[in-house]
Amino acid sequence: MTVILDSNRVNSRSGVDSSLVIFLHGYGANGNDLLGLADQLSEHLPDTVFLAPDAPETCSVNPGGFQWFPIPWIDGSTEEESERGLLRATEDLQMFIKQSMEEEGLSEAETILIGFSQGTMMALHVGPRMVDSILGIIGFSGRILNPESLLEDCKSKPPTLLIHGDQDDVVPFSSLSTAESTLQE
């Protein structure tokens, strides 16, 4: 069953909507966590609508926040629970992206996903599996989930910018090179 994701919005500065940015927050946060970036970005992207959905599940280690899927080494969930959560979150996010584009009258070619940590994981999991390529993916401090399945399921290759600090103690810096090599195949 697909969950309709709650979302927050910043309208385009110009009032003319020609592109869409969807922010995907990290584990334990909510959509508002990244929405503040819209103020700075809208100066350079005045025709852009910014959306920031809350992930579909309440975070078990931070009940005030949300998670896209459970993370076993953080919350004690099983690998199976994590996989089921990822499948559900993928369906929910795909539906959110589709509905958002329809509501805004915009296409994949006018849509960018920007993620942080677990939000980057979702962007890299969903974006390349879309039949029509999105405008791009920008990811901070994330990784590719199941690189082998992405290679099998990849339908498009959106331009992707990945940024990752070498002192990250949550998502290893080595995840950046794995993502780079997977996305270039």
Please tell me what each predicted stretch does.
Residues A109-S156:
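Primarily recognizes the serine-hydrolase "nucleophile elbow" in alpha/beta-hydrolase
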Residues T2-E110:
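Serine-hydrolase catalytic machinery in alpha/beta-hydrolase-like enzymes
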Residues N32, D169-S175:
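Conserved alpha/beta-hydrolase "acid-adjacent" motif
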Residues P159, E180-E185:
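Catalytic histidine neighborhood in serine/cysteine hydrolases
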Residues E57-P63, I144-S149, V170:
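A short beta-to-alpha transition loop/helix N-cap that caps and shapes the active-site region
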Residues L161-H164, D168:
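Short beta-strand/loop motif that positions the catalytic acidic residue
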